[in-house]
Amino acid sequence: ERIAGVLLVGYAVASLLAAALSVAMLASGANLRSIVAFLLGGLDGASWPRVIAAAAPILAATLALAARGRPLAAFLLGDEGAMHLGIDVRRERGIAIALASLATAAAVALAGLVGFVGLVVPHLVRLAVGPDPRAVLPLSALGGALLLLLADSAARTAGLPVGVITALIGAPLLLTLLRRARAG
């Protein structure tokens, strides 16, 4: 648990600093703009054919994860608790990781690397509705979509990649959530 906290703090700080560095790079040269735009993500290059192509694996993975609600909920009991309920922990964990990776790969192919949406939103949803993945997964998807739309609107207004906005929102929120979790 402590190692995970250290890793998440490191990710938050690194992403915030990378966003600041990327803004400086964007201002300095046109050749770097396309690389940095992908690294920080955005919806400006999205088209209906690309959205439909990405939607298929995302929807398939999401529905498959939703169908695995019982094993995912059993993980809340820890590995031993899940095993006592008859869950093949290694198999189910592998399936969950593969499905999450499929959805993530499709989303990154569409929008680039947009940080913090998948870290912060599920934590906030979990605080609001509890840990049951049958509620957390769909609400996180809706909350993530809403955050991305709001961040994209702000990014377009400011002329920045959406990843800069999500880092500016997500890093402080993640650090606050981690500090609260550590304190209590």
PLM region spans:
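Alpha-helical transmembrane segments in inner-membrane proteins
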Residues: E1-G184
